[in-house]
Each structure stands twice: as structure tokens, then as C-alpha cells.
Amino acid sequence: GHRADMAIFPEPSNFRIYPTIKGELYFKLTVPGKSTHICNRHLVAQPLPHGVERPGVSAIDNMLKYQLAILELEKQWNLWRSNEHVPPGGMFININTMQAGTSLTSVPDSAEATGSLLFNPDLTAAEVENEIRATLDRVTQSDYWLREHPPVLDLPLDSASTAPWVKEPVNLAHDHPAVGVIRGAHQKVTGHTPEVTISPFVCDANFWFPLGQPCLVYGVGDPSWGIHGANEYLPVADLIQATKPFAAVTMDWCGVAS
């Protein structure tokens, strides 16, 4: 399709310039168990005599093993995978939803967790996926029952569309000409020089940049203003004020006919 010299995504950066954006992946982990009545809990969690078949296995107990491994991986990432643009603790894994069991009187036979992760811009989605899979596989191999009944990891997790939702990082050079033009235009109109830094969020720019489209984020609003929540808002005065630097950027980048 058509390509532009530059694409500006007017996400709520509060007029900061974001040429760098972390990558993002979503996942779903389904961990099996074996259902039995709760009166058999002692036969689920404790050693059994030789020859006695274990009547049940708690999927929640098994899920906890994987969750702890994920938390440890997150810790190791932030200890050893630093990046010049990412603040400490900026590479993380978040468990967003958990569901397990169907009865108050049974050991759960399945547990499901979904989550998302943001990763440093110097990594690729494939590298991160491989590390996640290796981490979870070590848990599986350490448990006799799970070796025979491994979990199912959907990574990357399919979005509402037909394609897996993979957001690769954006790594536009901070000295790219567009950054200078936006800084200059903003300073000319407002009297303030905007900060050039890494975005705290991902956006549609993550889909465009891997396709060869130079892009960055620069816009009005702030994530603290109810974004993705109740009473999301943008002051009208700020919206009107935003038109001025955008007009200046357009004229300075594209030029004005004489």
C-alpha cells in the first residue's frame, strides 16, 4: 500500500514525543487437573502409599507453580535485561484474568489465566515468546503429573480478529528529522520544548512500524485522564490548543507553497 515519509499517531502523550515504544503480547495459559470430591483433598496434596492411585489433582495448585515461575521471569528480566530508554521495572508480565473449577465441592480439573506483557524495544516478539515457553516448560518437566498432562499455552493469543495480536516494538531513531521538526514546531507555538522519551503504552504504531512505515507518537491528553476507564475525557481547551502545534508540524514537514 501507500507509504508516507512519516506517520504521527496522536495518542495521549501530553505533547511528549515518543519515537520508542515497547512491544506487547497477550497470552492464555490453560492448566489441567483431575477433579474429585473435596473430601479427598488429603489424597490430592499428600504422599500416598505404594499402589494407591491418586484420585485427583488440583489445577489451581498446578497453576500456582506456573504463576510463580512467571513472576520470577519478570524479576529476572528487570534485573538483567536493561534498556537505555526503559525505566527500571519497565518490562513486565501481568496476569489479567483467572478462572478455575466449576463447583464448591470439587477439586478443580482446569485453571485458565490470561495475561499481557510489555517487553523492551531491543527485543522481538519471537525472542520473548521463546523465553516464556522455555520458562513454563521447565515447570512442566519438574512435575511428574504435568509431564504427562502438559498445559496449553496460546501465545500469541488471538485477538478479536482472525490474526494473533502481536505488537512489535517501535524503534525510530531519536535524532530522526521528524523528531526535530516536531520539537521545533511545538517550541515555536507554545514556547516549551517537548520531552523526547519512550512511550508508557503501546498503540497502533506498533502495527505500522514493522511494515516499514516510520512513525512516532505525539498528541494531546494523558493516560491518567480516565483512559480505558470510566469518565474518559479531554478538555476542549486542550483539544483546541493541540491544533496549533499540529498545524505547525504539518507546514514545517510538508512545506508551504509560495
Residue ranges and their predicted role:
Residues 1-26, 30, 254, 258:
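Acidic/histidine-rich catalytic neighborhood of metal-dependent amide-processing enzymes
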Residues 32-258:
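Metal-dependent amide/peptide-bond hydrolase catalytic core
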